[in-house]
């Protein structure tokens, strides 16, 4: 099979099916895809941002040793090299201007020529090699079916991002992941056609994940992000009456904020589900199920940053006395080495009732409890490293022989700095951990078959109550995206779909969905110096991001 489309999109694939005997058959194939890209990067001579190449192959074999035993094997590998991340500049946001005014500052647009343009100087890309393999063994006894599914996955990938997404040479990240995952599921279930349909199973999963993600601050980034931010803080201090004048100079041409992380995950589950058909009356069925989930997540982290070589000047006028102190040869290291772990135990029930009055005509209602795993934000270590670097720089100043340890003014300077530029405490666990997400889901609907089996209709209404909802957002420093928990949200809506066979050759389909998803308890507060908390953002009643309010699909098929 070969195909082509606009914007230099091409694909080719080859598949072979072969049956060697009544007991064994297999299929194998390969593919290659090229995408020319659509979005252009103005900072790289209008280079296509999203061009990509991908290729791979697969094998599947089915072996029947006997009439009641089947072995299904699958193996696939895919390699892809993609451009991406077509983020364009929208200009300074009104909220940023308002926040600056609150802090007594004024923000002006200095990149007006780049508004609406994708413009960053380093090529951003994602490269991945993915191997999947699995074996499904199924044994059919007289009264039950026993199946065992074993899976293995190997992932090697590399993500490179120009993280400032501008034409300036500020900073970038190269994140690499190496993951090995093995899973096993054993299911014992009733054979079809029985009044009592039941299934009991056990599931186990273990993943080894090794991640490296150094952030490289280039010369402009060292100046604008490290040096200028520090001096801005000193300027705020110096603006106070009687305060000293302070200034910092960073000598590093570049600065690497690195990290190596091992985040293994262990998961296991036991579950059972029973469906009682024709309960009390013909066509009425009731389903009840329960799943016990256990999950243990851990993280071993080793985050090391290039020591900052910096100088510091301190000037203070105290009556007739002029204090002028300086040290241009200080070093400030920053590192985090340690481990974290946590585990969760969950009970996830399921209830359903259905009434079917004719084949493929029914009404139903379901209630389920949902759960999404928690985890660790390893990209938060870039923010933590910046905070630790600032703390380390303050400590270096305090320990400097010519400043903090000055025989005459050292103690005075240390006391002043402790009051004006206090060290920030760092809680690695609180800063990097996000909690699981929980939900209760309710749905009622109907499946209808009409027009002598030529028209199918599906309608449903749903309601979802979510707690500790997980959201993706940029870290405060801009160094990567993180997952946060956002209190509570509520979603409700309806869906409808129609599919019609107009003739033997022609079928038409249309579907529509409406979802109203809003936060019900999501308020962000910030602790003030006096210990009180100030509301900085109130999202109650606001829409949950990335949940479309309306979806519509219209299609047809002629064959």
Where are these regions (language model features)?
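Gram-negative outer-membrane beta-barrel transporters
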Residues: 189, 197-199, 203-205, 280, ...
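Solvent-exposed loop segments that connect transmembrane elements
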Residues: 39-48, 85-118, 164-171, 214-258, ...
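Transmembrane beta-strands of outer-membrane beta-barrel pores
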Residues: 2-8, 32-36, 77-81, 141, ...
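Outer-membrane beta-barrel channels and translocator barrels
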Residues: 21-22, 33, 64-68, 141-142, ...
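Outer-membrane beta-barrel domain signature, strongest for Gram-negative TonB-dependent receptors
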Residues: 46, 52-199, 205-211
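Outer-membrane beta-barrel translocator/receptor signature
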Residues: 1-41, 47-57, 69, 129-133, ...
